[in-house]
């Protein structure tokens, strides 16, 4: 399943998101959700421990001035890769 987080993790039921993640799921951080990728924040450690791949939309990182501040554990992708993820996953959950 593809999970997309478009809101700030501080304004989301992040605990529920983590509970619903399953091994093999993928999470795309976009819009204000990319703030979860910033090194040193409390949400990043939870994502590192989850059995998933985590991506962040590069355009949203640039728009928020975060490109140099994200963790190396987060995979930065463009819109083409975003489309590939949506095609890959028949089911999706937006947060």
UniProtKB/Swiss-Prot annotation:
Protein family according to the UniProt entry: Belongs to the DsrH/TusB family.
Alphabetically ordered keywords of this record: Cytoplasm, tRNA processing
Known function: Part of a sulfur-relay system required for 2-thiolation of 5-methylaminomethyl-2-thiouridine (mnm(5)s(2)U) at tRNA wobble positions.
This protein's encoding gene: tusB
One Pfam family here: DsrH
Compartments (UniProt record): Cytoplasm
Protein name: Protein TusB
Any single GO CC term annotated in Swiss-Prot or TrEMBL for this entry: sulfurtransferase complex
Subunit field text: Heterohexamer, formed by a dimer of trimers. The hexameric TusBCD complex contains 2 copies each of TusB, TusC and TusD. The TusBCD complex interacts with TusE.
Superkingdom of origin organism: Bacteria
Listed PANTHER family: PROTEIN TUSB (PTHR37526:SF1)
UniProt source species: Escherichia coli O81 (strain ED1a)
Gene Ontology biological process terms from the UniProt entry: tRNA wobble position uridine thiolation
């Amino acid at each position: 399943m593809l999970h997309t987080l478009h809101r700030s993790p501080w304004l989301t039921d992040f605990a529920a998101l983590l509970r619903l993640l399953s091994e093999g799921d993928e999470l795309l951080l976009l819009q204000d959700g990319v703030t979860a990728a910033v090194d040193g924040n409390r949400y990043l450690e939870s994502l590192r421990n989850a059995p998933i791949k985590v991506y962040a939309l590069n355009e949203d990182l640039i728009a928020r001035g975060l490109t140099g501040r994200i963790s190396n554990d987060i995979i930065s992708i463009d819109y083409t890769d975003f489309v590939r993820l949506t095609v890959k996953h028949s089911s999706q959950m937006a947060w």
